[in-house]
Each structure stands twice: as structure tokens, then as C-alpha cells.
Amino acid sequence: MFLDYFALGVLIFVFLVIFYGIIILHDIPYLIAKKRNHPHADAIHVAGWVSLFTLHVIWPFLWIWATLYRPERGWGMQSHDSSVMQLQQRIAGLEKQLADIKSSSAE
């Protein structure tokens, strides 16, 4: 009789550990996003709960989404290439020349 109650207690304990373990596991992307001050941390948290109902299909994408952002560099997709800066300077110079030509022709 004692072993029946003990087995029932172990079964309930294992069920609770698995239940709360899955919940904690799905909060990992949110915790990463919160630590990195991610601008979409709330959306990642909600999507983590939605992934519980979608059989965890989107959970790996949430992990990637949470780890892509860093406050010091943003999304890491900005290109600070020198050629872009040179082109911007050339365009500014051409616009200045065009404005000078327009002002001289108006006189």
C-alpha cells in the first residue's frame, strides 16, 4: 500500500517537474531578450507562450530572434562601409554644385 502512494507521489512530482520545466524552457528566449534590452522582448515573450500551443515549432526561431539584437550594435546589419560614405559625400557635393548653378542662372 505504501508503495502505491509513493509511486503516485513520484508520478505527480515528475509531472510537475516536466510541466514547469517546459514553461521555464520556453521563457529562455524572453530572458535573453530582456537581458539584451531587446525592443521586441514582449513580443518574444508572447510568442514563447504561443509556441507551447504550436508544438514548439517556432521556439528555435524565437531563440534566434532574441539573440540577434545587441544594444551596442543594434541588429548588426547596418553597413558602415567607406564607399557608402564616399557616395554620400559626392551626392552632397553635386547637390551643392547644382544649387550654385541654379542660383547663378537665376541672376
Swiss-Prot record:
Keywords: Cell inner membrane, Cell membrane, Membrane, Transmembrane, Transmembrane helix. Its main location: membrane. Residues 30-43 are periplasmic. Residues 1-6, 67-107 are cytoplasmic. Signal peptide: none annotated. One of its GO terms (cellular component) is plasma membrane. It holds the Pfam family DUF3302. It is a multi-pass membrane protein. It is found in: Cell inner membrane. The chain crosses the membrane at residues 7-29, 44-66. To E.coli YibI. This is Inner membrane protein YiaW. The lineage of its organism: Bacteria, Pseudomonadati, Pseudomonadota, Gammaproteobacteria, Enterobacterales. The gene is yiaW.
